């Protein structure tokens, strides 16, 4: 996308104020990648539906979807070791890796379709080829990586994966991680050439820029949804604050999607649906070390993921990433966990405390008691100085110099805590759709893998909220045009996997 396109995608014209007690078909709360994806689905499937989207900030995609607030990894389980666990018999469970990879392939199909339809423009502004690598040292970790490679290689999705313990080969793949390292040090790496770096914020902006220029779609920035109430006719009444006019308006909607990231839990609680009882959120922030030094950025073209320390949560996997943000190449290393009681980067310090209820306080306390390693990890992270964080970087880049790197604060993640009969409360690290009994209201809670699986996750949501339409010929016909693998399993055939990937790679210029 040229400079003018970038400026255009940021300039969202202001609509006239909402009319009191307006009735609409769908309300999208939040303007991140999830709401953008659901919004484009509904506009393609039901162009005559009236859709309102409310965003409390003055721009779309400014929380977790923003390029600087996430790692930008097209999560495809190529390099993330936490998606492959060890079974009791010592074998490797690759089921989650398959699910995550297939989900990302679905996202690429959606973006390819949107490029063909000129809804998205200039694919290099939001997705670029960056090989994905796993990199470990130490005998136990090397044995794990070798075994993981063996099991993944047998599946069509990962058949093209490479493995090496050879110093020179790994140095060719990623020079910076081997410079300054002894040639006798035992290390191992895997590599997938077709990995990507994704700017989810750019995708979000471009989709909303298209949507807000279409009839029957209304984007309201600086509008904050503060309450959701069930009407007698089973529709939903939303109280919306116009932060420009300092006015509260009521709006009625047949369907509501709460896609406001960390803000979703509190709005879900306000809806008072039975299914929300017992859910809580645990906020975890993140920091990255970043460099724009061209001597470094020009000498590293990969996303290199390591192995988490024992007891550390999945979101703690250390990685050194090539990023392309607004056309500029940078390197990021992290994440380093931070703690704030905010549920959103631009949220309130009261977020955590105001989300506490008599139903979720016990699950939260039980999670703290039952996850001592997590608590210990977070305390250690909070006590770690910039020098300590730089020392972690040196494990991956032995020749790194502190003067080249600065520390940035990324977005907030709110992990799911929910009631459990046996343990009282459990901490979940994935995402989960919570919906009302009649499926007219849904919320997305949780974090990783998040944005990478947005197309697949919102397809699942379509099946829940619009179960009476998803199998009708009109919707099926359209969905089959968008997704050439719709309702098919990609991983069952290597030839089919190649066909799908060649199709999307050609359109997305990968």
Curated annotation (Swiss-Prot):
Enzyme Commission (EC) number: 1.1.5.4
PANTHER family in the cross-refs: L-2-HYDROXYGLUTARATE DEHYDROGENASE, MITOCHONDRIAL
Keywords per UniProt: FAD, Flavoprotein, Oxidoreductase, Tricarboxylic acid cycle
Lineage: superkingdom: Bacteria
Keyword Oxidoreductase in annotation: yes
Record field: catalytic activity: (S)-malate + a quinone = a quinol + oxaloacetate
Group of enzyme by EC: oxidoreductase
Originating organism: Wigglesworthia glossinidia brevipalpis
Signal peptide: none
Keyword Flavoprotein listed: yes
Name of the protein: Probable malate:quinone oxidoreductase
Cofactor annotation: FAD
Pathway(s) it belongs to: Carbohydrate metabolism; tricarboxylic acid cycle; oxaloacetate from (S)-malate (quinone route): step 1/1
Record-linked Pfam families: Mqo (PF06039)
Entries under HAMAP family matching the protein: MQO (MF_00212)
GO MF term set: 2-hydroxyglutarate dehydrogenase activity; L-malate dehydrogenase (quinone) activity
A GO biological-process term: tricarboxylic acid cycle
Similarity section: Belongs to the MQO family.
């Amino acid at each position: 996308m040229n400079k003018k396109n970038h400026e255009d995608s940021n300039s969202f014209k202001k609509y006239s104020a909402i009319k009191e007690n307006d009735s609409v078909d769908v309300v999208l709360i939040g303007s991140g990648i999830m709401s953008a994806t659901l919004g484009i689905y509904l506009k393609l499937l039901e162009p005559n539906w009236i859709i309102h989207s409310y965003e409390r900030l003055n721009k779309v995609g400014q929380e977790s979807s923003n390029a600087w607030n996430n790692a930008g990894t097209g999560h495809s389980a190529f390099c993330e070791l936490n998606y492959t666990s060890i079974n009791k018999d010592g074998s490797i469970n690759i089921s989650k890796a398959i699910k995550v990879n297939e989900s990302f392939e679905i996202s690429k199909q959606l973006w390819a379709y949107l490029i063909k339809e000129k809804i998205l423009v200039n694919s290099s502004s939001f997705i670029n080829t960056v090989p994905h690598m796993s990199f470990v040292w130490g005998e136990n970790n090397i044995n794990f990586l070798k075994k993981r490679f063996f099991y993944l290689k047998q599946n069509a999705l990962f058949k093209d994966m490479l493995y090496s313990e050879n110093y020179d080969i790994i140095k060719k793949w990623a020079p910076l991680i081997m410079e300054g390292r002894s040639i006798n040090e035992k290390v191992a790496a895997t590599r997938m050439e077709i990995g990507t770096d994704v700017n989810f914020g750019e995708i979000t902006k471009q989709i909303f820029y298209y949507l807000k220029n279409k009839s029957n779609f209304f984007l309201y920035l600086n509008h904050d949804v503060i309450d959701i109430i069930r009407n007698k006719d089973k529709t939903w009444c939303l109280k919306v604050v116009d932060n420009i006019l300092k006015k509260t308006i009521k709006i009625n909607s047949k369907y509501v999607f709460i896609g406001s990231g960390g803000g979703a839990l509190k709005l879900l609680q306000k809806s008072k649906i039975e299914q929300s009882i017992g859910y809580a959120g645990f906020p975890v922030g993140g920091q990255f070390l970043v460099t724009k030094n061209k001597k470094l950025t020009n000498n590293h073209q990969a996303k290199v993921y390591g192995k988490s320390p024992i007891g550390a949560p999945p979101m703690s996997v250390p990685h050194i990433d090539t990023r392309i943000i607004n056309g500029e190449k940078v390197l990021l290393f992290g994440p380093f966990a931070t703690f704030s009681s905010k549920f959103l980067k631009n949220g309130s310090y009261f977020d955590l405390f105001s989300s506490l209820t008599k139903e979720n306080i016990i699950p939260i306390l039980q999670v703290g008691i039952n996850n001592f390693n997590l608590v210990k990890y977070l305390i250690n992270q909070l006590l770690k100085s910039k020098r300590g964080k730089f020392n972690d970087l040196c494990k991956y880049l032995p020749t790194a110099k502190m003067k080249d790197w600065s520390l940035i604060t990324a977005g907030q993640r709110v992990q799911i805590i929910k009631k459990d009969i046996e343990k009282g409360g459990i901490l979940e690290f994935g995402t989960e759709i919570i919906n009302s009994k009649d499926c007219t209201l849904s919320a997305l809670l949780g974090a990783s893998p998040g944005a990478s699986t947005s197309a697949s996750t919102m397809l699942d949501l379509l099946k829940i909220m619009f179960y009476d339409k998803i199998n009708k010929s009109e919707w099926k016909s359209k969905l089959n045009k968008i997704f050439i693998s719709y309702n098919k399993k990609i991983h069952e055939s290597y030839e089919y996997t190649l066909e799908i990937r060649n199709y999307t790679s050609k359109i997305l210029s990968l």
